[in-house]
């Protein structure tokens, strides 16, 4: 498991998607590094405010997963998140899509039912959402038409593959080629080819995979050892599944790129075929001129065969000779 650093967390948050797998994988990583709860929540809060509107709700889903699943290990995250949640809920309710209101209310109801936080604090969070509904600046209203939910974005991406290809400028070919090569090179180190991790997973003890073997545990010390092993196995598998999910998306993107690249090459091929035909015609015309020129040259008289018109003849008289009286 990779060590904690703020830059590593920022990178993981930038890659966070709305899928349950992505949220749970990052949640497990954060819980594993719970001794850094303070910096983690600080970075989470900062990145939440910087995130695009259609990703903000996912940040709260992540916080929910971390808060609820870390309670049995300690109160660190529950306490640290409490200090920023009022601002976070207010910010998300104000900046995110209108459709976020119900998920936020549902999340607060769950926290109230499970006593994640006290009733007074839950009420404070609800009030922060209501306060955020005060008339925003005009710029916010103008942005609403541009906001899309994660599902809409996914549907639009799916619509783009493969039927709705839009023709590309053939001159974009070199750029597409570079992008395609990079995508293929990136997949050389894909999760599915990570033999080291696969070997670790294959080497996991049977106890972490078979519930029936739990009956053999008779003392607390053995149970705690197994609990630690299970946590590590869960973290290993969750992270690997997350990498596999990311690889799957990369391969989908590569498939879309291949469709685009193939169409681009077809466009280039069509253009080059026209150019080839054009230059074939030019070659034919130049060849015809060459042939006619050669024939014309052969029809001209050979001046070297003419007699020497100056040899053996007397020189012409000079002007003085013409007017001489002799």
Swiss-Prot record:
<feature type="region of interest" description="Disordered">
    <location>
        <begin position="127"/>
        <end position="149"/>
    </location>
</feature>
<dbReference type="GO" id="GO:0045944">
    <property type="term" value="P:positive regulation of transcription by RNA polymerase II"/>
</dbReference>
<keyword id="KW-0007">Acetylation</keyword>
<protein>
    <recommendedName>
        <fullName>Regulation of nuclear pre-mRNA domain-containing protein 1B</fullName>
    </recommendedName>
</protein>
<dbReference type="GO" id="GO:0005654">
    <property type="term" value="C:nucleoplasm"/>
</dbReference>
<dbReference type="GO" id="GO:0010564">
    <property type="term" value="P:regulation of cell cycle process"/>
</dbReference>
<feature type="compositionally biased region" description="Basic and acidic residues">
    <location>
        <begin position="128"/>
        <end position="144"/>
    </location>
</feature>
<feature type="modified residue" description="Phosphoserine">
    <location>
        <position position="166"/>
    </location>
</feature>
<feature type="modified residue" description="Phosphoserine">
    <location>
        <position position="134"/>
    </location>
</feature>
<dbReference type="Pfam" id="PF04818">
    <property type="entry name" value="CID"/>
</dbReference>
<dbReference type="Pfam" id="PF16566">
    <property type="entry name" value="CREPT"/>
</dbReference>
<comment type="similarity">
    <text>Belongs to the UPF0400 (RTT103) family.</text>
</comment>
<dbReference type="GO" id="GO:0008284">
    <property type="term" value="P:positive regulation of cell population proliferation"/>
</dbReference>
<dbReference type="GO" id="GO:0001111">
    <property type="term" value="P:RNA polymerase II promoter clearance"/>
</dbReference>
<comment type="subunit">
    <text>Homodimer. May form a heterodimer with RPRD1A. Associates with RPAP2. Associates with the RNA polymerase II complex.</text>
</comment>
<dbReference type="InterPro" id="IPR047882">
    <property type="entry name" value="RPRD1B_CID"/>
</dbReference>
<dbReference type="GO" id="GO:0005634">
    <property type="term" value="C:nucleus"/>
</dbReference>
<dbReference type="GO" id="GO:0000993">
    <property type="term" value="F:RNA polymerase II complex binding"/>
</dbReference>
<dbReference type="GO" id="GO:0099122">
    <property type="term" value="F:RNA polymerase II C-terminal domain binding"/>
</dbReference>
<dbReference type="InterPro" id="IPR006569">
    <property type="entry name" value="CID_dom"/>
</dbReference>
<dbReference type="GO" id="GO:0097550">
    <property type="term" value="C:transcription preinitiation complex"/>
</dbReference>
<dbReference type="GO" id="GO:0031124">
    <property type="term" value="P:mRNA 3'-end processing"/>
</dbReference>
<feature type="modified residue" description="Phosphoserine">
    <location>
        <position position="299"/>
    </location>
</feature>
<feature type="modified residue" description="Phosphoserine">
    <location>
        <position position="132"/>
    </location>
</feature>
<feature type="modified residue" description="Phosphotyrosine">
    <location>
        <position position="161"/>
    </location>
</feature>
<feature type="domain" description="CID">
    <location>
        <begin position="2"/>
        <end position="133"/>
    </location>
</feature>
<keyword id="KW-0805">Transcription regulation</keyword>
<dbReference type="InterPro" id="IPR008942">
    <property type="entry name" value="ENTH_VHS"/>
</dbReference>
<keyword id="KW-0539">Nucleus</keyword>
<comment type="function">
    <text>Interacts with phosphorylated C-terminal heptapeptide repeat domain (CTD) of the largest RNA polymerase II subunit POLR2A, and participates in dephosphorylation of the CTD by RPAP2. Transcriptional regulator which enhances expression of CCND1. Promotes binding of RNA polymerase II to the CCDN1 promoter and to the termination region before the poly-A site but decreases its binding after the poly-A site. Prevents RNA polymerase II from reading through the 3' end termination site and may allow it to be recruited back to the promoter through promotion of the formation of a chromatin loop.</text>
</comment>
<keyword id="KW-0597">Phosphoprotein</keyword>
<dbReference type="InterPro" id="IPR032337">
    <property type="entry name" value="RPRD1A/B_C"/>
</dbReference>
<keyword id="KW-0804">Transcription</keyword>
<dbReference type="GO" id="GO:0042802">
    <property type="term" value="F:identical protein binding"/>
</dbReference>
<feature type="modified residue" description="N-acetylserine">
    <location>
        <position position="2"/>
    </location>
</feature>
């Amino acid at each position: 498991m990779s060590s904690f650093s703020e830059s590593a967390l920022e990178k993981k948050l930038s890659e966070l998607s709305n899928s349950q797998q992505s949220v749970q994988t990052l949640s497990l990583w954060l819980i594993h590094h719970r001794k850094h709860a303070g910096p983690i929540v600080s970075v989470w809060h900062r990145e939440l405010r910087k995130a695009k509107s259609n990703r903000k709700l996912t940040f709260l889903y992540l916080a929910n997963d971390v808060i609820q699943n870390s309670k049995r290990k300690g109160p660190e995250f529950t306490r640290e998140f409490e200090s920023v949640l009022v601002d976070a809920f207010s910010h998300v309710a104000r900046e995110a899509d209108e459709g976020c209101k119900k998920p936020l209310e549902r999340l607060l109801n769950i926290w109230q039912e499970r006593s994640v936080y006290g009733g007074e604090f839950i009420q404070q969070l609800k009030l922060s959402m209501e306060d955020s509904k005060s008339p925003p600046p005009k710029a916010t209203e103008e942005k609403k038409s541009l906001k899309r939910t994660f599902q809409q974005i996914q549907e639009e991406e799916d619509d783009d593959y493969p039927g709705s290809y839009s023709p590309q400028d053939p001159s974009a070919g070199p750029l597409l080629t570079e992008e395609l090569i990079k995508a293929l090179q990136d997949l050389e180190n894909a999760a599915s080819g990570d033999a080291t991790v696969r070997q670790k997973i294959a080497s996991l003890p049977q106890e972490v995979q078979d519930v029936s073997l739990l009956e053999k545990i008779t003392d607390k010390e053995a149970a705690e050892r197994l609990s630690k092993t299970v946590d590590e196995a869960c973290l290993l598998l969750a992270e690997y599944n997350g990498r596999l999910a990311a690889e799957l998306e990369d391969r989908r993107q590569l498939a879309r790129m291949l469709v685009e690249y193939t169409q681009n090459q077809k466009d280039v091929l069509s253009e080059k075929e026209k150019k080839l035909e054009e230059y074939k015609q030019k070659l034919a015309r130049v060849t015809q001129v060459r042939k006619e020129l050669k024939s014309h040259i052969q029809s001209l008289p050979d001046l070297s065969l003419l007699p020497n018109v100056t040899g053996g003849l007397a020189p012409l008289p000079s002007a003085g000779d013409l007017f001489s009286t002799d």
